[in-house]
């Protein structure tokens, strides 16, 4: 059996590459790992206990909240507050950012933004779901209560980002700006083990992921690109394969490994797109760029967008470089919206 490297060992090893590292970020990633194991346990038994389904309320996006959404939100929030590295959390499930006012938290360097359970409506039908997280250094003075400005930073200021995918196996994938690495959970040992080091997405792919049920509502450029994907041109390996799970983490993870593009454009119903810039697009864009891919709103680099509100939405195109550039060219050529 080859030498097995755990997530904890890997984090410490990478920390040693930076002579001035304090260990705070490593400890924070350890908190995320712990919360992920707790949430993974509940997801695995969700069909046996009364924790699936909707609770009858909506989040700030107007989306029906699932019981596991709130469970995951509470567990990740508690894990962050219990350590002294985080001064506040912004979550897709919370109307406002949550600041931690204990002395030990006010002296923390970092804020975290998260989608605690992406794709949670799929749990009832046993489809993979995930957690997405994004970490920034605070810009407000250490020792004070964090401000809105700490959370409204462009994605190019992220110091770390990642996701956990709860599927046939559970994986944690993360970057600190020096490559992207994946760890698979071994339930018999209770540890995440390095399984995918320095992940890279192919420059070209043959998979496109989009909810084609909304085709009639898409901008003209996106419609033209879908037709391009469907054309029978064997010399260009077309038609491409359409694969759409409906869970961003799951679709992203597959395309990262195999090559492809994930698209959630603006529609007549969602003119600014549906995905959240801070909780979904920025962390996934950071990961994708570290893997050699591209993330765009159809015109601009996602990581260069300066957010103006916590729950801001944007169109999102992410994946293999040549595929994202191709859809951008169609959007530029056919600027009509719908």
From Swiss-Prot:
Mg(2+) 1 binds at residues 92, 115, 117. Substrate binds at residues 118-121, 211, 244, 274. Its EC number is 3.1.3.11. It catalyses: beta-D-fructose 1,6-bisphosphate + H2O = beta-D-fructose 6-phosphate + phosphate. Pfam families: FBPase (PF00316), FBPase_C (PF18913). Keywords: Carbohydrate metabolism, Cytoplasm, Hydrolase, Magnesium, Metal-binding. GO terms for molecular function: fructose 1,6-bisphosphate 1-phosphatase activity; magnesium ion binding. Pathway: Carbohydrate biosynthesis; gluconeogenesis. It is found in: Cytoplasm. HAMAP family: FBPase_class1. NCBIfam families: PRK09293.1-1 (NF006778), PRK09293.1-3 (NF006779). Homotetramer. Belongs to the FBPase class 1 family. PANTHER family: FRUCTOSE-1,6-BISPHOSPHATASE-RELATED, SEDOHEPTULOSE-1,7-BISPHOSPHATASE, CHLOROPLASTIC. This is Fructose-1,6-bisphosphatase class 1.
């Amino acid at each position: 059996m080859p030498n097995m490297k755990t997530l904890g060992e890997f984090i410490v090893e990478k920390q040693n590459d930076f002579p001035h590292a304090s260990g705070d970020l490593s400890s924070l990633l350890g908190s995320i790992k712990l919360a992920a194991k707790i949430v993974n346990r509940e997801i695995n038994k969700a069909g046996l206990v009364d924790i699936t389904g909707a609770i009858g309320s909506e989040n700030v996006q107007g989306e029906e909240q699932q019981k596991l959404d709130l469970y995951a939100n509470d567990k990740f929030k508690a894990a962050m507050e219990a350590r002294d590295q985080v001064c506040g959390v912004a979550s897709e499930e919370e109307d406002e950012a949550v600041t931690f006012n204990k002395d030990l938290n006010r002296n923390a360097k970092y804020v975290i933004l998260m989608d605690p359970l992406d794709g949670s409506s799929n749990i009832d039908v046993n489809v993979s779901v995930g957690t997405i997280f994004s970490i920034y250094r605070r810009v407000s003075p250490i020792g004070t209560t964090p401000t809105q400005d700490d959370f409204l930073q462009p994605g190019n200021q992220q110091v770390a980002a990642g996701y956990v995918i709860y599927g046939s196996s559970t994986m944690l994938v993360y970057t600190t700006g020096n490559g992207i690495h994946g760890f698979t959970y071994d339930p018999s040992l209770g540890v995440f083990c390095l399984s995918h080091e320095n992940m890279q997405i192919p420059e070209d792919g043959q998979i496109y992921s989009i909810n084609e049920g909304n085709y009639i509502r898409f901008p003209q450029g996106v419609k033209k690109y879908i037709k391009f994907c469907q054309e029978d041109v064997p010399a260009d390996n077309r038609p491409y394969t359409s694969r759409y799970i409906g869970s961003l983490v799951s679709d992203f993870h597959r395309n990262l490994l195999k090559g492809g593009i994930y698209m959630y454009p603006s529609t007549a119903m969602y003119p600014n797109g549906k995905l959240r810039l801070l909780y979904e697009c920025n962390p996934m864009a950071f990961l994708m760029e570290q893997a050699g891919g591209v993330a765009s709103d159809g015109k601009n680099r996602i990581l260069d967008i300066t957010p103006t509100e916590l729950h801001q939405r944007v169109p999102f195109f992410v994946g293999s470089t040549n595929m994202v550039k191709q859809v951008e060219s169609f959007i530029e050529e056919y600027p009509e919206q719908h």
